[in-house]
């Protein structure tokens, strides 16, 4: 993976996860509870998939791109 592509991908992954966090917070406003739980149960796996299949592979090649460092 070329570094410039990794940089651009990381920027997009960070935007994506930020947007998923907005969605997670909005889901907390959903009623009834059954609907909220149905939506919410899918958010964890989506965040995990972003981490496992996007974030970590980029950092494997370019650990210096880790925004948490």
Residue positions per predicted region:
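N-terminal acidic leader/helix
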Residues: 1-31
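Short, charge-rich amphipathic interface segments used for partner binding and complex assembly
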Residues: 12, 30-66
């Amino acid at each position: 993976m070329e570094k410039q592509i990794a940089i651009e991908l990381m920027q997009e992954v960070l935007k994506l996860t930020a947007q998923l966090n907005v969605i997670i917070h909005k889901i907390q406003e959903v009623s009834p509870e059954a609907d909220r739980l149905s939506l919410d149960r899918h958010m964890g796996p989506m965040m995990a998939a972003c981490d496992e299949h996007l974030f970590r592979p980029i950092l494997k090649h370019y650990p210096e791109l880790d925004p948490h460092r």
